[in-house]
């Protein structure tokens, strides 16, 4: 009887061992990250993301691909939705139906939020200390973005909202061209980006520092309600509070409202949930100081700002990202609520 019991136990043990074999390893999955131009801040941050994925995932592998620009990022994610994620811009809200910019290119609504990346905070600047508000630009020459660029739509919408679009002469060159034309005296004011690490670390950046070799630069701000109204109407204008003297102790004595066209990681809605969950996990678990090694602006890739969306009303999170955030009790936030 004892022998039978021993044999029975051995058989049961062997069967149990067979039943608790390790689950087969998840097949390796390769993705590409559309990183834009190599000179853009989101390109090195995307290189960082690829490195983090390759180091921290047991089954996911990533490689960064340069594109013609941030619009190229979205285009390739749209064309190859199961292979690419990318860095998107809030300005691509104009891809939506009903927007002339998107209608010309072919509308697209499949992008889904994963995590916040970087700022593109801006206001109007001038050498003319007499121009103190947007309405003072009437009769002046103003540089906005390049013709055909998505952010130009937002620049013109701001001028229209303040009632001066039909009262100014427009020049279309973008930020670098606008800086050159302002310095050469060919325009009176230009839209200009400056460096911004969330929530409130501001520096002038190279364009403004170069302009100051000619003379002091003055800053023309907006107001929060107007920017929020524009955002609700599907323009890329996230309000940003710039405290007094944050840009310059002499030429910016008063606080002002600028606006941000944030960038963020996206995947097409057709990208599988498991892959995006894993990407989101790695983004979340990688601390800000690791991101900042790839670009200084990565310093705001922290738990406050990673889940901050350009608009909770206008965007959806990818199901894989939302699953990760929900499982870990992480609330998706409106970026505008964090920048005032």
Report the location of each language-model feature.
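Ligand-binding clefts/hinges and TM-proximal coupling segments of bilobed small-molecule sensing domains
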Residues: 144-158, 234-301
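Bilobed "Venus flytrap"/periplasmic-binding protein-like clamshell domains
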Residues: 30-56, 60-61, 120-186, 195, ...
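Short, low-complexity disordered leader/linker segments with a strong preference
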Residues: 1-29, 340
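Short Pro/Gly-enriched coil loops immediately N-terminal to beta-strands
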Residues: 107-121, 211-215, 257-260
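Pocket-lining segment of extracytoplasmic ligand-binding domains
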Residues: 90-92, 98-102, 130, 166-266, ...
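N-terminal (or domain-start) structured segment
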Residues: 26-95
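An extracytoplasmic/periplasmic, membrane-proximal ligand-sensing/linker region
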Residues: 194-214, 219, 231, 274-340
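Sec-exported extracytoplasmic/periplasmic mature domains
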Residues: 50-59, 78-82, 129, 160-164, ...
């Amino acid at each position: 009887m004892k022998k039978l019991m021993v044999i029975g136990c051995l058989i049961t043990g062997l069967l149990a061992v067979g039943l608790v074999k390790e689950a087969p390893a998840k097949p390796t999955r390769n993705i590409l990250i559309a990183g834009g131009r190599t000179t853009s801040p989101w390109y090195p941050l995307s290189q960082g993301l690829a490195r983090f994925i390759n180091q921290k995932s047991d089954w996911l592998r990533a490689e960064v691909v340069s594109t013609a620009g941030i619009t190229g990022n979205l285009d390739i994610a749209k064309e190859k939705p199961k292979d690419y994620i990318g860095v998107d811009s809030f300005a691509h809200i104009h891809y939506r139906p009903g927007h002339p910019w998107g209608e010309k290119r072919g509308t697209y609504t499949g992008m889904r939020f994963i995590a916040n990346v970087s700022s593109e905070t801006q206001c109007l600047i001038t050498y003319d200390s007499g121009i103190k508000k947007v309405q003072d630009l009437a009769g002046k020459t103003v540089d906005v973005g390049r013709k055909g660029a998505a952010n130009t739509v937002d620049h013109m919408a701001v001028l229209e909202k303040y009632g001066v679009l039909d009262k100014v002469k427009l020049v279309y060159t973008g930020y670098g061209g606008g800086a050159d034309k302002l310095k050469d005296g060919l325009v009176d004011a230009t839209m200009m980006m400056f460096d911004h690490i969330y929530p409130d670390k501001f520096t002038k950046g190279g364009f403004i520092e170069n302009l100051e070799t000619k003379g002091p630069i003055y800053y023309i701000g907006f107001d929060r309600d107007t920017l929020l109204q524009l955002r609700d109407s599907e323009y890329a204008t996230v309000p940003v509070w710039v405290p007094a003297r944050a840009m310059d102790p002499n030429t910016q004595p008063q606080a002002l409202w600028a606006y941000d066209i944030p960038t963020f990681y996206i995947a097409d809605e057709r990208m599988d949930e498991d892959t995006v969950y894993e990407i989101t996990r790695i983004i979340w678990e990688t601390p800000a100081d690791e991101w900042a090694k790839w670009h200084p602006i990565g310093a705001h890739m922290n738990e406050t700002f990673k889940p901050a969306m350009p608009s909770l009303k206008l965007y959806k999170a990818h199901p894989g990202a939302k699953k990760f955030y929900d499982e870990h009790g992480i609330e998706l936030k409106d970026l505008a609520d964090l920048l005032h």
